């Protein structure tokens, strides 16, 4: 019996007898590109996106009833897997409590207290609805606190789709940036400086000329939105030291890495305390939640305590707060991180061997905790986007479709990382590797 099968006749009748191809054609008539976030369109890998109907544990089920072992996991929020039983029970309870208050309530307080008690640099916490909102708000706080306007970011780090950060580096040193999207005005990015990762010297030179104008340096301490570009600790320490020398606030974007690589995220693993930090994904337990946190004096600048305005109708909604709280409590109670790390290494080591055995190119897995990224093997670690091997996108697309056809779902882009969850137990991993071994015989 398929435990993922939807029970509502009203829901299942909508797609009964339909194919993903049919639904995608209909979707393109009513939504841009047929999707509600670009990567879901399969544009990067080609083909038609699979329309999924349900999910449970480590498994996705499409509208035809076919099952897939999921290593995308909604791009990171589901560290316990789909519909973890404990979280699901809390969600069911919440339907009988409230769907939204738009008022003060105790659930956000409990989650904020848990985060603040375990994350010392998160002295105060403000919940929002997404990682993009969290970053936007954190940078607003940084500008207010410093009285400065410029923001320094790094090529290869993604911080959401706010205008000022959809910027790529130009050919010059931080001064010739261009937007990553149509519809963004030149004035929106005029105060954004962009530098390559893994280059301390460039950071120092920019601060020598612009230091007094830079409100915040923002970085993913574990860049995981353009492949997995693991940075040297020495680089991170140096840029933080340089920023603080000039009175610039340090913002760590831990929307992906927060509560994924450890309860204190990369900041805790590195022993580097940011001034402000952004979280998302895991803290909502699968619901749309983000937050920004930091030192008390900085967060007290936010309305109604201070002059920095930020608000949201559904901020701290009870579903996200209670699901996030249940997730973090279970993560904390069951000490899942070391187990997930071990499982990820076992999975990626064996999968890499299978790929290398069947493929005409040599693959390797870049891993950190329970994140992984398969790519062409290189002589040196890849820490910058300009060093990603040519042809990677095409090579990954072939692997993606080989696996998809046989019931393994990876993120549909060669530049997206994969994830394991608590639901990916030894049996699921063994089954995945068995499927991959058979699938790659026709690779």
Swiss-Prot record:
Gene3D superfamilies: Aspartate Aminotransferase, domain 1, Type I PLP-dependent aspartate aminotransferase-like (Major domain). It is found in: Cytoplasm. PROSITE patterns: AA_TRANSFER_CLASS_3. Pfam families: Aminotran_3. It comes from the Bacteria. GO terms for biological process: protoporphyrinogen IX biosynthetic process. Its cofactor is pyridoxal 5'-phosphate. One of its GO terms (molecular function) is transaminase activity. It comes from Leptospira interrogans serogroup Icterohaemorrhagiae serovar Lai (strain 56601). Keywords: Cytoplasm, Isomerase, Porphyrin biosynthesis, Pyridoxal phosphate. It is an enzyme of class 5 (isomerase). Homodimer. Its EC number is 5.4.3.8. The modification N6-(pyridoxal phosphate)lysine is found at residue 281. Belongs to the class-III pyridoxal-phosphate-dependent aminotransferase family. HemL subfamily. This is Glutamate-1-semialdehyde 2,1-aminomutase. Pathway: Porphyrin-containing compound metabolism; protoporphyrin-IX biosynthesis; 5-aminolevulinate from L-glutamyl-tRNA(Glu): step 2/2. One of its GO terms (cellular component) is cytoplasm. It catalyses: (S)-4-amino-5-oxopentanoate = 5-aminolevulinate.
């Amino acid at each position: 019996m398929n435990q993922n099968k939807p029970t509502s006749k009203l829901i299942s009748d909508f797609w009964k007898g339909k194919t993903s191809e049919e639904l995608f054609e209909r979707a393109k008539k009513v939504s841009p590109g047929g999707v509600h976030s670009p990567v879901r369109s399969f544009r990067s890998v080609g083909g038609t996106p699979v329309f999924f109907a349900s999910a449970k544990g480590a498994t996705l089920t499409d509208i035809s009833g076919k099952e897939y072992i999921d290593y995308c996991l909604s791009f990171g929020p589901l560290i316990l897997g789909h519909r973890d039983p404990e979280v699901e029970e809390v969600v069911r309870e919440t339907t009988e409590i409230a769907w939204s208050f738009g008022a003060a309530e105790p659930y956000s307080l409990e989650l904020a207290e848990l985060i603040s008690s375990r994350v010392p640099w998160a002295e105060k916490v403000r919940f929002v609805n997404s990682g993009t909102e969290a970053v936007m708000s954190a940078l607003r706080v940084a500008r207010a606190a410093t009285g400065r306007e410029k923001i320094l970011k790094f090529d290869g780090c993604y911080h959401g789709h706010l205008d000022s950060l959809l910027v790529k580096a130009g050919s010059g040193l931080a001064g010739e940036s261009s937007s990553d999207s149509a519809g963004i005005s030149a004035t929106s990015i005029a105060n954004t400086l962009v530098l390559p990762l893994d280059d301390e010297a460039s950071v120092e030179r920019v601060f020598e000329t612009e230091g007094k104008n830079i409100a915040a340096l923002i970085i993913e301490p574990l860049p995981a939105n353009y492949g997995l570009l693991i940075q040297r600790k020495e680089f991170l320490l140096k840029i933080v030291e340089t920023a603080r020398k000039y009175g610039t606030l340090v913002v760590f974007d831990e929307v992906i890495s927060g509560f994924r690589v450890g309860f204190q995220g990369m900041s805790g693993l590195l022993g580097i305390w940011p001034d402000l930090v952004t979280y998302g994904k895991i803290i909502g337990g699968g619901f749309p939640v983000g937050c920004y946190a930091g030192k008390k004096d900085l967060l007290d600048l936010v309305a109604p305590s201070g002059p920095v305005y930020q608000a949201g109708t559904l901020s701290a909604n009870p579903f996200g707060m209670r699901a996030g709280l249940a997730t973090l409590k279970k993560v904390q109670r069951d000490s899942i991180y070391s187990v997930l790390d071990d499982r990820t290494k076992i999975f990626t080591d064996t999968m890499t061997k299978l790929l290398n055995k069947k493929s005409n190119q040599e693959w390797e897995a870049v891993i950190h905790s329970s994140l992984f990224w398969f790519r062409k093997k290189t002589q040196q670690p890849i820490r910058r986007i300009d060093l990603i091997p040519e042809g990677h996108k095409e090579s990954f697309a072939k692997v993606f479709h080989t696996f998809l056809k046989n019931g393994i779902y990876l993120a549909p882009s060669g530049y997206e990382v994969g994830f394991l969850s608590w639901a990916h137990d030894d049996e699921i991993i063994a089954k995945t590797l068995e499927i991959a071994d058979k699938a790659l015989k026709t690779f």
